[in-house]
């Protein structure tokens, strides 16, 4: 069989492409480079400037905030963006603070345990304070009615506001016969009726009547003359106002002169008024002055107005004690009787007076050193706290204005120095000059 065509060996091979064969191209050749692809993927997710977006411009936010064209724009959209940014910044700061506090609280719990760690965190301000039943629920749940009953006895009623304390009935007074069994009970325990229902109004009222402050008020209403100085001074005005609704009568009794008359019923009212005036209206200071006078011996002599303050000649008496802070002490010659804390004192002969003399009249026989450095600056002017017992009742002193230092020097200048300093205090030079005159 013959073939009509040339042999295959003689047919020239021409490079022809078969149309049925598919062409395969690698996918990496159709994509861009790896660097360009990464930039193309992340650029749409980079933060953009919101102000520029409001005005139709797209700009990356990194390094753009300072150079933004619309950073000071006050339009409605930009103002809303600024407010939203402020709120978001506050929320982020709060979340950071809460996360830090939680981490610190977690560390404290690991160190000290759960309850102690939360307590320390709340005490240091790391955690906001929670109610007691959340942290110490087991401790608070153990307390029963006994702790509630003791609550009314341990804490005074003056610490509880007036709105929380129940008002007493109008007919029942602290001094009425109905309240006598209650007041007769012990101060530290409430009445038997108040124990079963400690939270009721009856328990509050009876425990209020059984407090020591109300008992003092009841005794004060029955016998005001038998009140001691301690009981009259104890209890502030606020506590008495809380206990007794009739504050007008107590206000009249709390005046300084009334307090002094109740504390010292044996003293005259005029004397107490004068002492109070000299102390500048200070009740405590006036009581100290009177108590210091009463602590001396009752047998000592009293000073009269003419003999003590206005005598020109020196009056010698060994029974009197110094009324002036600048006066000399009695046993000045004996070293053993002097105190180690007493200041150095010159000889009494330089002043022409004895150790216990008082010249408060025309020329005043005072020690200038002791007068200048007075040890007692409170109370009456130049008055020592160790005055005689009869000094106050006899009114043996001048008004406080006469004790000014300028008046003392003025009275002293009216008298010649030879009458006061008989032994030549300032040496022969001054005395010779005086003799020449």
Curated annotation (Swiss-Prot):
May be involved in sexual development. Disulfide bonds: none annotated. GO terms for cellular component: nucleus. It is found in: Nucleus. One of its GO terms (biological process) is germ cell development. Residues 179-201, 223-235 have a biased composition (Low complexity). SMART domains: DM. The keyword Nucleotide-binding does not apply. PANTHER family: DOUBLESEX AND MAB-3 RELATED TRANSCRIPTION FACTOR DMRT, DOUBLESEX- AND MAB-3-RELATED TRANSCRIPTION FACTOR A2. This is Doublesex- and mab-3-related transcription factor A2. Belongs to the DMRT family. Residues 49-96 bind DNA. CDD domains: CUE_DMA_DMRTA2. Keywords: DNA-binding, Metal-binding, Nucleus, Zinc. Residues 160-253 are annotated as: Disordered. One of its GO terms (molecular function) is metal ion binding. The gene is dmrta2. Residues 254-289 form the DMA domain.
């Amino acid at each position: 069989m013959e073939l009509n065509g040339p042999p295959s060996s003689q047919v020239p091979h021409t490079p022809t492409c078969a149309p049925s064969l598919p062409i395969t191209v690698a996918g990496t050749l159709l994509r861009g480079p790896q660097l360009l692809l990464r930039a193309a993927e992340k650029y749409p997710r980079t933060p953009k400037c919101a102000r520029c977006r409001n005005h139709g411009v797209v700009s990356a936010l990194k390094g753009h905030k300072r150079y933004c064209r619309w950073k000071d724009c006050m339009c409605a959209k930009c103002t809303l963006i600024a407010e939203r940014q402020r709120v978001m910044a506050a929320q982020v700061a709060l979340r950071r603070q809460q996360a830090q506090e939680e981490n610190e609280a977690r560390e404290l719990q690991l160190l000290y345990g759960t309850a102690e760690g939360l307590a320390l965190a709340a005490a240091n301000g790391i955690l906001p304070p929670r109610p007691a039943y959340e942290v110490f629920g087991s401790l608070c749940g153990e307390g029963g009615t006994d702790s509630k009953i003791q609550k009314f006895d341990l804490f005074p009623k003056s610490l509880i506001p007036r709105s929380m304390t129940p008002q007493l009935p109008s007919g029942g007074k602290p001094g009425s016969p109905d309240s006598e069994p209650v007041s007769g009970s012990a101060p530290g325990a409430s009445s038997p009726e108040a124990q079963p229902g400690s939270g009721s109004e009856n328990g509050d009222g009876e425990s209020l009547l059984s407090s020591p402050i109300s008992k003092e008020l009841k005794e004060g209403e029955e016998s005001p003359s038998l009140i001691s100085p301690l009981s009259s001074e104890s209890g502030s005005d606020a506590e008495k106002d809380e206990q007794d609704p009739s504050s007008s009568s107590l206000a009249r009794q709390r005046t300084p002169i009334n307090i002094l008359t109740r504390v010292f019923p044996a003293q005259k009212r005029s004397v107490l008024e004068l002492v109070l005036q000299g102390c500048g209206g200070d009740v405590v200071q006036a009581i100290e002055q009177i108590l210091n006078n009463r602590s001396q011996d009752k047998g000592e002599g009293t000073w009269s107005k003419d003999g003590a303050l206005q005598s020109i000649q020196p009056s010698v008496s060994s029974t009197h004690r110094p009324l002036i802070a600048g006066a000399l002490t009695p046993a000045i010659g004996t070293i053993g009787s002097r105190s180690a804390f007493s200041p150095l004192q010159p000889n009494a002969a330089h002043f022409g007076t004895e150790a216990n003399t008082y010249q408060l009249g025309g020329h005043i026989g005072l020690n200038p050193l002791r007068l200048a450095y007075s040890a007692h600056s409170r109370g009456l002017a130049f008055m020592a706290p160790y005055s005689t017992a009869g000094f106050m009742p006899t009114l043996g002193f001048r008004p406080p204005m006469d004790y000014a230092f300028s008046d003392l020097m003025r009275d002293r200048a009216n008298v010649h120095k030879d009458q006061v300093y008989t032994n030549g205090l300032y040496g022969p030079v001054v005395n010779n000059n005086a003799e020449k005159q």
